[in-house]
């Protein structure tokens, strides 16, 4: 697993985790400046931090109170390392508490937007207005600053909203600069990274590739690596990166379960197998999957069948390869968000992180996860740096069960063909309209509804196709995309005229929540 300690040749700022829901945003903001950042446990010791040699440390926010018996704290030697520290919300309170100040429950809790007033010539607020909007989320506040600090910011309900000790380069803010609602939050974080910590912004995908290739070669040696290739962005980027690092020591298994989008299997083989030279074993399992799904209409049962069948197929092929070629490593497209969402001791688990496809735990492979320090947008940037085509790098998110959950009810080959053809038209027209980078996800779905229509001089009784298109930042919430009417009309006309057995198109204008993005 790549971690911040491995990145010895780049500047880095570490974030110590105290459980804030915004932790991921802090690391993202710092990386946007070209400075590598990673979230580490608050239990990380001063000695471990000394070995990492960061340019700066950020204490995150968190839900606890510093005066609670079981409150999260840190190794006090961290304050003696001579490394600049920025405390955010709980982080500012913890620094104050540790260094001799006082923290107490607030008479009026602050949640949401507040007006911050800057006092004097504060380092982190250079070049920003004396009054600015910030995002507060706290129930406690600093009532007495620690020795060596001065108050540099205040708000109506938080008299001590920002502090600094310029000599030791310790800073604290009661608000959340990482949240977009703090209008000059990015400026503050940039001042900390560049002016206080002295970073130059040397983090890039180019040097990530160099470091990761070297690390993979050292880890793998002359052994063989197996990768489950789905055709999605993450596994494709992993494949190309591994190919660059170890060449023909990599073998990819691509399971075509018959539930892929139009032309997807061919594109994977032509692009990844052709241009990039990946050694891909394609397993044609269409009949196997469709026979297992025959007569099944319950969505959860469909998901379970597809997931289990994928495991069986992959396991069969992996076992063969392990015996024949002595495969030692299994590569996965795990992202940094997967690692974070697995939960830590400071936060509730959002979702369990499993290996790809729920592969059997008794498979005797050592894991390689070269993307597990990267966010999704960084993975796309990495793919571009590796020379991968936009058609793969900017591919739409696609669920593991594939079109199996975009055909509502029982799955048949005829229904799958309707979804494939209509979805291909939708993607073509969205791209032609220049909307493919603006809409977060878009696809067609077959609800299983048939209705009366008229085509030519005859009556029809054919299927309805639904179009789902949403805008989102992180997928947790989403709004339906405002696609121009003329584009929707063109899509509708083409689908009805070009896709057999379709006579009606509907557009889903439901947000998430209450609906989910997928229909099943």
Curated annotation (Swiss-Prot):
Reactions catalysed according to its record: XMP + L-glutamine + ATP + H2O = GMP + L-glutamate + AMP + diphosphate + 2 H(+)
Active-site residue list: 89 (nucleophile), 176, 178
Recorded GO CC terms: cytosol
Glutamine amidotransferase type-1 domain segment(s): 12-202
Pathway(s) this gene product operates in, as recorded in its UniProt entry: Purine metabolism; GMP biosynthesis; GMP from XMP (L-Gln route): step 1/1
Superkingdom classification of source: Bacteria
InterPro entries in the record: Class_I_gatase-like, GATASE, GMP_synth_C, GMP_synth_GATase, GMP_synthase, GMPS_ATP_PPase_dom, NAD/GMP_synthase, Rossmann-like_a/b/a_fold
Binding site residues for ATP: 230-236
Top EC class for this record: ligase
Keywords: ATP-binding, Glutamine amidotransferase, GMP biosynthesis, Ligase, Nucleotide-binding, Purine biosynthesis
Tagged with keyword Chloroplast: no
EC number(s) on file: 6.3.5.2
Keyword Nucleotide-binding: yes
One example GO MF annotation: ATP binding
Domain GMPS ATP-PPase positions: 203-395
Assembly: Homodimer.
Function: Catalyzes the synthesis of GMP from XMP.
Name of the protein described by the UniProt record: GMP synthase [glutamine-hydrolyzing]
Organism, scientific name: Enterococcus faecalis (strain ATCC 700802 / V583)
